[in-house]
Amino acid sequence: MRNEISTLHRETGVAWDATAKLYEDSEKSDIAFLRDGGNNLMEPEQRILSDLETWCNCAIHLQCAGGKDTLSLLTQGAKEVIGIDISQRMIASAKRRSNSLQANASWYCCDVLDVPKSLDAIGDLLYTGRGALPWIMDIQKWAAIVRRLLKPKGRLFVFEGHPLDWIWDTNTSDIRFHVERNNYFTEKIVGGERWPFPFLARQEDPELVNLRMHERQWTLGQIFEALLNVGFNLIHFDEYPIPYWDQFPNIPKEILTRLPHTYSILAERN
């Protein structure tokens, strides 16, 4: 099973390498945004994390992509940030951003389930979310890794897309079950078709037609169980009617906001 999971993660990493150009193209604008004190974290994230300067010497960001959110943690007050991602091109893009800003940041390219032991127990904060968890094929191992990276009393913060959004049709103008993906409790692995990045990459380069990405849904219950099993104490949980990306472009806001589209978890390592 572990070898199978590694293969799925590796194939997804290759696909993210191929789609990284979309992040590379925004490097200059991201650098200017961050240099001017910009913060890419959403309002609930900024409010819950508050001023990191008072308690966070080191923030670790799992599945950091191009690093814009990672570097925003410095704007939020963290003294040092560490970004981890499976895509080499994403990490290279993140490094270019931080080097231009002379930011106190370091970057590691690896599967998040194989993070080096040298990072054990150094994080005051572990930050993740906004499309990160569905790419993880073993949520129990993920929770154990999160605990490993945090200091005692270190905090995990997750701001993620709500699992209910998996079951809705993204092409309709009202809330309607997806024809195939309509079971909240499904454990089926799917091919990343919910995301625009692979589609846009294939449009630019038809040779990428065989890109393979693998994601699956984790229910809120599965996520909480994984964290409780490794000894986290829950501090905060909330749900929000705001999506973190334009997943339902045809649904009017007054209808869309009747359902949760994101959630946040703040938990402390024992």
What are these regions (language model features)?
Residues 117-126:
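A short acidic, Gly/Pro-enriched loop at the edge of an enzyme's catalytic core
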Residues 155-200:
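Conserved class I S-adenosyl-L-methionine
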Residues 230-232, 250-270:
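Core SAM-dependent methyltransferase catalytic element
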